[in-house]
Amino acid sequence: MEHGSYEHSCGCVPGKGTDGARKVIKRWVVNDPKGTSKVAVLDVKQCYPTLPHEQLRLKLEKRIKDRKFLRLAFKIIASYQQAMANKTQLLPETIAVGIPVGLYTSPWFLNFFFQDLDHLIAEKCGLSHLVRYVDDMVLFDNSKKRLHAAIRTVGDYLQHMQMRLKSTWQVYHLRIRPLDFLGFKFHANGKITLRKSILYRISRKARTIARKGYASVTNASGMISYKGYMDHSDSSGFYEKWVQPFINFKVLKGVVSNENRKQCKALCAA
C-alpha cells in the first residue's frame, strides 16, 4: 500500500511519523526561505467517519491486483460503518461511509486513499513543499494565490469523494506567525518551539512527580514522551528551568522498565 505514496505523507508510516514531518518542514524552512514564506494549513472534516467505502474499494482495485489481499481488505472495510457508532440503520455497502478510529488498518487506508490527492496538489498546483499527516495538510509556497488555488483543488477533490474540507483552513505569512503543527511551532528563522499548552502540561507533570516523591507508570511514561518533544525542539532553556530540577529521567525509565518486565512475566506465566 506504500507503493506510489507521496514522499512526505508522514502519518503512521514507519520511519516517518511526527519526527519525519518535523525534520522535513525544518529543512524546507531553512534551505528555501523564499519558497516557504507563505503557508496554508488545512484538514479534512470528520475524516474517519466520512470515508466512503465504495471509493476506497475502487482505489484499491485499481492499484492492487492481489485478489487475496483485496478480499481481506474488503472484509475489513465492510466490517464497520459510521452508522454503527451513531446507532442508526446500516446502509448498503455502495453508499456506506466510515472507518474505525484506532484500528491498525485505518490510517493505512487513509494514507492510501489520499495518495491521488497528494500527487494532484504537487503536479496540478505546482507546489513542491507539501506535508500530510493523515488528514492534516501543510502547504508552502511564495504565492498566496497558488496556495488558495491549491485549497480550491483540495476542496473540489474532497467534494467529488463525498467528503469536505474544514472551513477553518488558513493562509498566512510564516514570518508573521509561526506554523503550529503536530505540537510544534515552526518559525521563519528555522527555530522550533513547543505549544504553550504542551509546555504547561510538561511543567505541571514535573511538579506533580516532584511533589509526590515518586512516579506512577503513567506519569513516568508520559514524562519520557514529553522529553522526546523537548529534545526535538529548541526548548533547552525551558527544560533547565522547569524540568531538570524536578525530574530524574533514569529513575523514570527504571519505573517503565520494571512495569514492562512484570507484564512480560505475567504473559509468560499465562
Question: How should each PLM-predicted stretch be described?
Answer:
Residues 88-96, 148-155, 165-270:
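Right-hand nucleic-acid polymerase module
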Residues 1-10:
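Electropositive, glycine- and tryptophan-enriched low-complexity nucleic-acid-binding patches
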Residues 26-134, 138-153, 173, 229, ...:
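Conserved polymerase palm-domain catalytic core
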Residues 64, 155-163:
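A common structural junction motif
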Residues 11-22, 41:
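Long, hydrophobic, well-ordered secondary-structure blocks that form the structural core
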Residues 10, 14, 97, 101, ...:
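Short glycine-rich loop/turn motifs that provide flexible caps or phosphate-binding loops at active sites
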